[in-house]
Design a protein with these regions (language model features):
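ATP-grasp fold ATP-binding core
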Residues: 64-84, 117-120, 260, 394-396
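Glycine-rich, small-residue loops and helix-cap segments
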Residues: 72, 112, 288, 307-310, ...
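Enzymes and membrane/adaptor proteins characterized by extended Gly/Ser/Thr/Asp/Glu-rich
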Residues: 69-106
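An N-terminal boundary/leader segment
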Residues: 1-52
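Short glycine/serine-rich loop segments
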Residues: 103-104, 108-229, 427-437, 443-446
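A short helix-breaking turn/cap at a secondary-structure junction
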Residues: 191-274, 334-338, 469-470
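Gly/Ser-rich, acidic/histidine-flanked active-site/gating loops
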Residues: 72, 84, 211, 234-312, ...
Length: 470
């Protein structure tokens, strides 16, 4: 498998003129040519544009600097995030020919920082899935073991970094869609506090949970990308008005840090997984305490009710009238039915149907409103926990990467892949997945840390120090 150095190494190399932006793009091109046919991580690749941009930067002697910290560095973008003039398919037949007329705020900020957008990555259709098997463009294979999934829904973004097709990538995370693929591919996946990163230009799945996230090789790289894309945005009223704190990354573990593992997240966990997550802390001399958060056990059920309901509303816009696929029939209703019937995949239809049912008269109180009450109670339980500790520890996923096709026809089993990443998402908390130094059958295991709301900088700083000690 090919690879590329992390941003934290490429940036000083560019500054010292040990390589050029074109050299980096050429390495990426070779990696894509060597791996992409087997892995299927990209939906579109912009190699010619990237080469042109790299040459322009080199000719002008523009290297990473305070105004353009990512000058010459290739970044991949999940294909549910808008890049002006390029396709934004959401891996769905209904948007297969859609061209975005504008840049998402995060893309605009990356471009302003000098980044080269190398391509758009594969995903589960409309980001609905945990294995990248619902994409109309085919499954993404895990570069570490091509018989295994890369995770989902941001499987393409994770796989691209794992084989060296970009230096960093953006994914999206509604209930684990960036953290779980990062765990499966041995990478870092950081989900910021809800509202820290603008969602403008992200195609909506469940608006109250969706977040754009960096997927990188190191915590330092994730912190750099986050520092560029985070901050208030007048186009997204859910963003915090304050500029996020600057991360001070240190290799020294802060003294007196209190970490608790969530009891309910380890009760039914495989013993090998448990050891791979706990042992690194024992090795570094960090004492863990046990903390019970009983409500996390119901998080998947509440997450599904709420996200399916929001999806049924958000995806109502795909009707074949204004944009996207249109299957013309004699009558308007027939056109709607034919367009959505042919344009949307099985899993997306399932979620829309269940979500619509949960919002229907006579059932909304029993399902949707009950889930909202649960969400509020869960958030309070997390707040109470953080009055006692600084960080909470849990697995990122219940297993290492599973085989392609293993869960595809078992929706419940697939949904439970997100059992450890939905509760902190529902509570709008920042969380990060970092790879354990211990593997299981040569496959990586993700360690997840969660911090109080808006403590993103503190979480990144601690995760960076922990990563260095691992």
């Amino acid at each position: 498998m090919s690879s590329i150095a992390p941003l934290s190494e490429l940036i000083p190399a560019l500054k010292r003129k040990e390589c050029t932006a074109y050299d980096i793009i050429e390495q990426v091109r070779r990696n894509i040519n060597d791996n992409e046919t087997d892995i299927n991580a990209f939906i579109n690749v912009f190699l010619e544009q990237a080469q042109t941009q790299a040459l322009e930067l080199d000719n002008k002697n523009i290297r990473p600097n305070p105004k353009k910290p990512l000058a010459g560095l290739p970044i991949a973008i999940k294909d549910n995030i808008c890049v002006k003039g390029e396709s934004c398919t959401c891996a769905s037949k209904i948007l297969a020919d859609f061209i975005s007329p504008y840049d998402a705020t995060v893309v605009k900020r990356l471009k302003n920082a000098g980044a080269i957008i190398i391509g758009k990555t594969n995903l589960d259709e409309f980001a609905m899935g945990s294995s990248n098997e619902t994409s109309t463009f085919g499954v993404v294979r895990n570069p570490l073991d091509k018989t295994k999934v890369a995770g989902g829904s941001s499987g393409g973004s994770a796989a691209v970094i794992a084989y060296g097709g970009a230096a960093a990538a953006l994914g999206s995370d509604t209930g684990g869609s960036a953290r779980q693929p990062a765990a499966f591919c041995g990478l870092v996946g950081f989900r910021p506090s809800y509202g820290r990163v603008s969602r403008y230009g992200l195609v909506a799945f469940a608006s109250s949970l969706d977040q754009i996230c960096p997927i990188t090789q190191t915590v330092e790289d994730a912190a750099l990308i986050y520092s560029i894309i985070a901050g208030p945005d007048e186009n997204d009223s859910t963003t915090y008005p304050q500029t996020p704190d600057i991360m001070e990354l240190t290799e020294k573990l802060p003294q007196g840090t209190r970490i608790a593992y969530i009891k309910e997240c380890f009760d039914d966990l495989d013993s090998e997984m448990k050891q791979a997550i706990m042992r690194p802390f024992q090795d570094t001399g960090i004492d863990l305490i046990e903390l019970s958060l009983p409500l996390v056990k119901q998080s998947v059920a509440a997450y599904l009710i709420l996200t399916f309901a929001e999806a049924s509303s958000n995806l109502a816009r795909y009707d074949g009238i204004r944009y996207g696929l249109r299957v013309a029939k004699k009558g308007l209703m027939e056109t709607y039915f034919a367009t959505r019937g042919q344009g949307l995949g099985k899993e997306v239809k399932r979620r829309i149907l269940i979500g619509t049912f949960g919002l229907s008269e006579g059932y909304i109180d029993a399902y949707y409103n009950t889930a909202l009450k649960y969400r509020a109670a869960l958030s309070k339980q997390y707040a109470d926990a953080f009055a006692k500790v600084d960080f909470l520890l849990s697995p990122t996923a219940p297993s290492t990467a599973f085989k392609i096709g293993e869960k595809k026809d078992n929706p419940l089993s697939m949904y439970l892949s997100d059992i450890y990443t939905t509760s902190n998402a529902l509570a709008a908390l920042p969380s990060i997945s970092i790879p354990s130094p211990y593997k299981i059958e040569n496959l990586p295991v993700g360690i997840q840390l969660t911090a109080p709301r808006r403590q993103d900088a503190k979480l990144l700083g601690f995760a960076h120090a922990l990563e260095r000690h691992f």
